[in-house]
Amino acid sequence: RVRSSAASVVYKRQELTEGVCGDRIPTFFMRGNHEIRNAYSIGLRDHYDYVGDRTYGSFNWGDTRIVMLDCGEDKPDDHWVYYGLNDFTQLRNEQVDFLKKELSSKEFKKAGKRVLIHHIPLYGNDGKNLCANLWTKLLEKAPFNISLNAHTHKYAYHPKGELGNNYPVIIGGGYKMDGATVMILEKKKDELRVKVLNAKGKILLDITV
């Protein structure tokens, strides 16, 4: 969660990026619902250069297309805890148009591999995703090689077709060390290798997509 000051955000960002050599290797931030909460959450935008100045977007890394979606909060906008201040319905609707354009774009169609990233899973979350009615139809035939998700705080792997998903789905683990995971994607020539490790370095998953 985003605490009360810029200093706390800078400290946390440093803590999270040092381990992946964020001073030398480009690091991309994808927010989840907890990064939307607390006093300084709006200040996060001052610390990151968002692609297209939006919290969702797409870009190429070599011949791999990365598509990032922002699910917003995990509760409806009219939930009492938000005091009428949220409008994530509009944000999700915006991304319907974005997805339609992205999936038909030359950059997407010509990509060697395609990676989808969003915080709240469309599959493997008991249907509790406010984006599902808007995005699932668009994505169910999209030729993604892998989808990377989080939110449930429990690692899971769903092979293509297991839950009606048209691509493999990996859900990252929790924030406590005994359930934490790291996902590593490595592209070599025509192969995209995906590994999931736990905090002890044990390989939980090693697949090529």
Residue positions per predicted region:
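Active-site glycine-centered loops adjacent to acidic/histidine catalytic or metal-binding residues
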Residues: 8, 32-33, 119, 150-151
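Short acidic, glycine-rich surface-loop motifs adjacent to enzyme active sites
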Residues: 105-125
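A short C-terminal boundary segment appended to hydrolase-like catalytic domains
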Residues: 186-209
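Single conserved hydrophobic/aromatic residue that forms the stacking wall/gate
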Residues: 1-7, 11
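Active-site His/acidic residue clusters
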Residues: 126-131
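Local beta-strand N-terminus motif with an aromatic residue
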Residues: 7, 111-113, 144
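Structural motif
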Residues: 66-68, 113-117, 148
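Extended active-site neighborhood of metal-dependent phosphoesterases/phosphodiesterases
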Residues: 12-104, 134-146, 156-175, 179-188
